[in-house]
Structures are given as structure tokens and as C-alpha cells.
Amino acid sequence: MFSAVFAGGVVFLGLTSCVSAVSGERQDAAAAGPPPVTSQAWSYPKNTRAARAGAGLTDFISGNFVGSARCGVCHDLLRDKAGNDMSISNHWRSTMMANAAKDPFWLAKVRSEVARNPAIKKVIEEKCATCHMPMAATETKAGHGVVAMFDDGFLSAAAKLHASAMDGVSCSLCHQIQDEKLGTAASFSGKYTVATAQPAPGRPIFGPYREPVARTMQGSVGYTPVYGSQTNDSALCATCHTLFTPFVDAAGNVAGEFPEQTPYLEWRHSDFGVNADRRYDIGENPGQGMNCQECHMPHSKEGGVNIARYAPPELQPKDHFSQHHFVGGNVFMLNVLQDNSASLNLAASFEKLEDTKQRTVRQLQNDTADLAIESRRAGDELTVVVRVDNRVGHKFPTGFPSRNAWIHLAVQSPAGVVFESGRPLADGRIAGNDADEKPGTFEPHYDAISKPDQVQIYETIMADTDGAVTYTLLRTARYLKDNRLLPRGFDKKNAAPEIGVYGEAAQDDNFGGGSDLVTYRIKTGDMHGPFIVRAALLYSVISVNFMEDLRRDAGLAEVTSFVRQFDRADKQPVTVAVAQAEIR
């Protein structure tokens, strides 16, 4: 019997409609028939520690920047016309952007890279600090100093620029980025421009609104607010989120650059991309494209936002206001921040971190991907075709190469489990994943799957200059595998090498812009139906194989600390999408 799973058919589960019976009522994934080996109900990792109030925002004045606390004096306690909280620092302080310098995974990874490549320590620390500690790095470079993170560098409480470093990706950095060469290679990898030679109070600080009122900010923080259309342009985000890192050969010689993350270039090669000559004001999107800010800094639905608490009378409420949510997909690290907020000295309370985490979960489960199933039975063989649709404007998983997503498919009969592929394990491993079981190997991309130890994992696998699998960024010369889900409209055959598809997916005609089709062929033996087919798209921020490689440097303080935090954290993946069908 043939069963199609569509929005109007037997069952369809994107995240807008949870698991459903034909009636459309919510039903637990294990409600019909025997429970699967692993539940496929909606899930995401949970925090394990008690609530904490959080420290105050960072307050400092340096040559070119001010701390977030100074900005919060006027830009907190904001509401839209319906009374919803629009406070900028209230939303920002619990994001990964605000905590970019305190992210313990990042700190551990940078320390590991430096230890493995000591000859280019200065290059590594400057490259990483430029986007994770951007105010301190920019201030140092403006004074012709040496950017340093460890030992007596920015991480030392005694360092002159410690406060500005620990304020992360903060207000007076992003809003001072000049409209110079944005969207070009000359601005990527942290090559943003700030007018460090301009003295107060004439130093420009950019916003998305025309004809700003200048005098309040000139007097309070020494900036002159001016209209800057770049603040509503993905190219501004691309200055750090298009990152090429140097790599070395086995002898330690720098041999080239590697595209560590390229979501802006992926976006530009998709239906979501907006041409540079079509830059538009906030709230005035004229076409089918969508900027980074429209997803990651969603507008107030109600409008009527007074953007400053002490606003001069001529400053009118704004109907288009970008909430500083900076929502991404990093649920796991937000949990780690919650679990360790005191030791990390976070400015965000437990509740604010929870708010950001819940926004992240909602984005993953409502706006990221959809699953659909078509299934049929012929004798003792079931054929199940799983379709995965990517709804975001870049590859998914996105950005840093530690992330992966995979299909967990389980088939049950009244007698028990018939077949299961991609079962998540409690320690974060994936049953059947070669990389988890045999170091130096990896799971290939599949068009068709017939064995339980074959798993469709959407990920990147990196190789060094000798062609061996590596998890050391500064040894990575190329991708052996990149089958991450492509955005709609992405033409893989004409993609530039830095955003290409690598491995078996490059030749898979069922893997293309916006979707992937995976066919499962399952022998039922002497088991009788009805058969319940359940599929889930699961997502993890740090793959176990990536983490196991980091453990090699557990003698380093930052690595030791993060290993401890990782080991006690909840490692269950986020359920991004689910689908279910019955075959009789």
C-alpha cells in the first residue's frame, strides 16, 4: 500500500504542526504501537544548574568605544505600542554575540589551535580576537599594538583593554562599521572599517533611520548618530561571518587559506540573496530576497517603538524596529552558558538566557526545515522516501564546522522495531556514524540507505594538506565532505569552490538547492504490518568526533574547563522537524 505524507495528506510534520493523527490532534511520537528504541518526540538539550541573576553590563570608555552599559542607559526599558519589551541590551546581553569573548568552546578551541601551531600564535590570536573581541582588537590595531588574547593579553583582568574585550560583539562596534568595501573580499575575515581617527563628539555612529536627532548622543557618549543603510545590509554581517583562515602544511609552513564559514556567500548564491544595488531601508523589502537582519533580528510586529528612553520630543516612534535577538541555532552553548554563568561572569540572568534559548528553539523548530515521507510496500520490502526541505537562506547546518544534522528514521511493527537508522545516543554519538566509531573516518553522503549502520548526516568533514581527516582548523586545506542542506535556488554545479558541495552529494541528483531526497529500502522479513514510519531531523552544535579531537589538548586550562562543562551538559540533539506515516 502507498502512503504519501503531505500537508493535506495522511500526515505532515514541519514544525508548525507537531506530530499528528489524521484528525490533526497532537500525539506523542510513541503513542501508536510499541515505543521506538529512541523517542522522536520534540526535544532539545536542557540546562542543569540553578538560576542566577547575572552581573551588570560592562561599563568603560576607551579611545573609540564605550561599554554596553553606557548604551543601555538610554536604550533599555523600551516598549512597542502593545507594551512588549523592546529593550536592546535586555535582548542582546544573553546572546552568543554578547558572549562571544566568554564562549568557553571558542576559548578552548583557540587555545588548542595556538598550542598545535605555536609558530603562528600571533596570527591566530589576532584573527580570532578581531571578531570575538572586536573593540579591544580594533583599539589595539589603531594604536599599532599587538593583538594578544592569552597570558598578559585581553583575557587577563589586568589588561588595559580587558573590559572592552569581554564586552564581546557590542553596540559601539557594529554601529561604527563604515560603508566601505562591504560585500567584497576586502571586508571579509574581520576586515571591517571603523573611523578610529575621528574625535568625539563628531565620531559617526550608524543607524537604520533617516534624519536622526544627534545632540543627545553627542553629549552623553561622544558619538554623532547618522543614517547608515549598511546597518540593514547582510554585507555588514559578512565582515565576520565570511571567514577564511590560514592553514599550514605538515612542516608548519602557511600554505593557503580555507573557507571556515561562508553563510553570506551561500546566501548570495540562493533565492534569498539581495544584490548590492538593491539595498533598502529597514521595513522596505521590495523583493523576494531576505537580509540576515530580517531573520536574526526580527522586527517588532506591533511597531510604535520609542528607540530611546530619554528621547527628545522630535524623535518619533518607529514602526520598524529590529529586535536585538541575534537568534541562531546554538541551543547547546546557551545551556552551557546557563550552567556556568557564575564562573563565566555573564551579564545575563538565567531568565534572559532562557528567553534567548527559547527563541533559538522556536527558530530551529518553526523556520528551519520541513520533513515529508512517501512510503510503499512490495512483498517483504518497504520503500520510504524522506524529503528534507531547507527553509533558511544559507546551508544548514551553518557556519562553524563542528555542527551536524541527521535523519533519524525508525520503522515499527506491532511486534517491535523493524529498522532504525541514526539513533542518537546519550553521550552525543550517533549509532552507525563511522566518525564516532572509527577515528579518521567519516560517514559518506547517501542517496539510498538499506542498512541500520548507514546514516544520512549533513555536515562538513575537513582534510589537511596530506588528505587526512582533521579537526584542526589551521591544518585544514579542503573539505572531503560538505553535504549540508542547500538553500532554495542554490545551483551546486555553478557554485564557487569556497561554497561548493563535496563528496558523494556533488553527484547526487536528488540533492540540490532547497532539498534532499533519501530513499530507505527496508526488509521486513516475517514481520507483519501495519508499519509505523517515523522520521526526525536532528541537530547538534558540537559533534562527538570534533570534541574527541579537542580532548587531545585536555592539559590546557581552557580545554580542561570546557571538557568538564561539556561532559556534564545535556547532549541530546534538537529536534528540528518530524514526519510520520503508516504502511499497511
Locate each region found by the language model.
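Local sequence-structure signature of Cys/Sec-based thiol-disulfide redox active-site neighborhoods
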Residues: G54-V73, K122-E125, D233
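Bacterial N-terminal signal peptides
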Residues: S3-S17
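N-terminal catalytic scaffold of extracellular/periplasmic and nuclease hydrolases
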Residues: C71, W106-K127, A137
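Primarily the internal scaffold of c-type cytochrome electron-transfer domains
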Residues: G33-A55, L78-A115, G145-Y502, D508-G512, ...
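Signal peptide processing junction and immediate N-terminal pro/mature segment
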Residues: L13-A32
